[in-house]
Amino acid sequence: MAEISKSIMVLPVSLLCSAAFWIFRVETVICIARTGRLIASDFLHDFEPLKRAHRVGEFGRARVVFVSDGIPLGERLWNEIRSGSGIIFPRFPRLYRCMMPNGFVKRIYLTDGESSDERRRRFSLPAGVPPSQGLALPAPAMRSGLVLAPGERFALLNCQRPELFNSLRRASGIEPDQEYKDVGWENFSYQFPNLDNYANARAKLAQENYPVVDLWDVVGNPVTLFSSGASGGVTEKSERDELQTWLFANCEIFVSGTSGAWWIAWSLGKPTLIGDSMWLNFDMPMTMFVPILLWDKHEKRLLTLTEMWSGRGASIRRAIEDSRGRLEAVRNTPDELAAAIRELRALTRKELMVDEELQSRVLRIAKDAVGKPDSQKTLALVSQSFLSGHMEILA
């Protein structure tokens, strides 16, 4: 009887704590949205630093390191992006869609216990050297074999290799021959990229007169190089951090498969092409700013952006997964991709941050790509992010 009474007492307490926890989260989201500051949490376990910042109440003064899948960049680059607007919690897709319909997204991870000087030593460009001004190559670039003339424009290609995903699997305790389930996203299995399509991407960029720098060839595996468990000494890691920072700061266009690296390029105002392996997952922040353009097979038209932000958009994923569904995504041909590259090259950094103008350009390119309504269109994400090889956007 005593145990039952104890359970009855514990239940209201646990419910109250749970309610307070979720109310606090919603309050935090709304508070940040009102400040116009960009603070986001990738996963549930990242929430504690945000709580500390919330108690301080001055998000703009929080000590930050801009990170993407464990790849931090320097304080100087953070200063380049800190004036944006928006708030994204991947775990609150419907809530933030309602509050922040412009969909501006950046990921920021709040840190404690590290001074700005320490971060500058580890992650920033050399003191006094601004990014994106045709800098001479840093010493690590020379040793890596990278050949570029000072000030020469180039495209940065993030061609992900299968060994990256194998390393992720092993880190998750999954053998490479097992189906990989991304933590937190049910019923999701990863498909390896088609490396032939990266060769096609290189060819298309070459047609647009872009020398291509392959991030993996020059820097190596970002997952192992820029994580706490990175191999090599501090000097080696520091040099690679410096080189990667330089590449992102000075590239003129960024093309990649599924990777957090697109957050870095996008936040620096770099024209970026995206086609993501997780395209079905409409809870991913990238689909907020870079809309997947959907073709209604019954009405024979593209969904409007308003429809994508509306309640109808919430059922899009289910409709696509259902073979009888009426919605399918639009796939770009190589010609449309080349047109998108030319469009992106023409955009200024200011224009990249104007959501409506960018989306109108995206829609114009996509409408040209649709062609006949009954053609076999399967997938494309146009503009402002990256190509995923296995989606065969360039096939």
Where do the model's predicted regions map?
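Active-site and donor-binding regions of nucleotide-sugar-utilizing enzymes
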Residues: I4-E114, D217-G220, L243-W246, A261-W263
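Short, well-ordered alpha-helix to beta-strand connector turns
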Residues: S85, N209, N250-C251
